[in-house]
Each structure stands twice: as C-alpha cells, then as structure tokens.
A protein has these predicted regions:
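Active-site beta->alpha loop and helix N-cap motifs at the rims of alpha/beta catalytic domains
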Residues: 3-19, 36, 40
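Catalytic domains of carbohydrate-active enzymes, especially glycoside hydrolases
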Residues: 19-31
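Divalent metal-dependent hydrolysis catalytic cores, especially in the metallo-beta-lactamase
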Residues: 1-3, 28
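Catalytic core of soluble alpha/beta enzymes
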Residues: 30-166
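Alpha-helix N-cap/helix-start and coil->helix boundary motif
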Residues: 10, 167-168
Length: 168
C-alpha cells in the first residue's frame, strides 16, 4: 500500500513524506509533472529525508513530454535516487512517447491513464510502451474487464498494480 504525496513546495513535500513514514507507510507515490528540473529536486530531497528503506514511486501525471521524461528519469537514475517506477510520464494517447521512454531508461514505466480496456493493455504490451500496467476498477469499467487485463498481462509476463480513483 502506498500513500500519495501531492505536488507542492519541496519543504512541504518532504514534511508530508516524513509524516507518512512516521505513520508507517513504506511506499510513497510522489506526484510531480509540473516543472521538470524542480521535480528532480523534489524527489532528491524526499529520498534524502526518508532514506533508502522507503520505496519511492513517481507519478508525473502526464506532465512531461517524451524527451523531457528521459532526461528527468535519467537524472534520477544518475543521482542514485532508486525510484521503483515512474507512472504515466506523458499524455495517455502518446504511446510512441511511452515506448521512446521505456526503451531509453532503466526505471520501469507504469501505464495508467493509457489503459482503459483489455485492447489498450494488449496494444501497450505488444508495442513495448510500458513495463507495468496500473488497473483501476472505475477506469476499466469494473471487475470483469480488470480481470481480463490482469490475464492479458500475465500471458505476457507483465506485472500489474491495482489502484483506485477515490471512488466511494
């Protein structure tokens, strides 16, 4: 289980991250995607504050373009920030951009907003546009389509993450 750290000032994000760790969370989902250079600084400050034992996931919220994504993710890799994955770095429809990124970085890329249906999952997996698939029941239309996506991913050896959209 992860907890989301909303994009904010570096100091506020570090404070929110430390608070989450104090409450027992060991996986933080860091929201970024507004300012590339500043995004790297945010992640670096959080990593320094929480230490190496806490998993960091980065959600760019479709906020970067493909080349910018490669530069930012490469910078995080070069700094040894040990990011578990980067979620949806580019616009949902930009599967060429996703593939461009996936081919050029070592950090796993998670498709989220790009996957609404089993057909989307097949296309993303076969094209090499992502390393991982994020499934949200509200987004996929319920448990049955979500299970189909899981089955498809399993056939291709692709891991899935199950998330939510704060539905009630």
């Amino acid at each position: 289980t992860d907890i989301t750290i909303s994009v904010n000032s570096i100091d506020q994000m570090v404070s929110d991250s430390l608070d989450a760790v104090r409450r027992g969370y060991r996986t933080l989902k860091i929201k970024v995607g507004k300012e590339g250079v500043q995004d790297v600084a945010r992640i670096a400050a959080i990593r320094k504050a929480v230490g190496p034992e806490v998993l960091l996931r980065v959600d760019a919220n479709q906020g970067w373009d493909a080349r910018q994504s490669v530069a930012i993710i490469s910078a995080m890799e070069d700094q040894g920030l040990d990011i578990e994955l980067v979620e949806q770095p580019v616009k949902a429809h930009d599967l060429e951009g996703m593939r461009y990124i996936t081919q050029r970085v070592q950090t796993p890329i998670l498709a989220d907003e790009s996957v609404f249906s089993p057909a989307d999952a097949i296309h993303i997996i076969q094209s090499g546009a992502a390393d991982l698939i994020n499934i949200k029941l509200m987004k996929t239309g319920g448990i049955w389509p979500a299970l189909k996506i899981c089955d498809i991913a399993e056939l291709y050896g692709v891991e899935c993450i199950i998330g939510c959209m704060l539905e009630s």
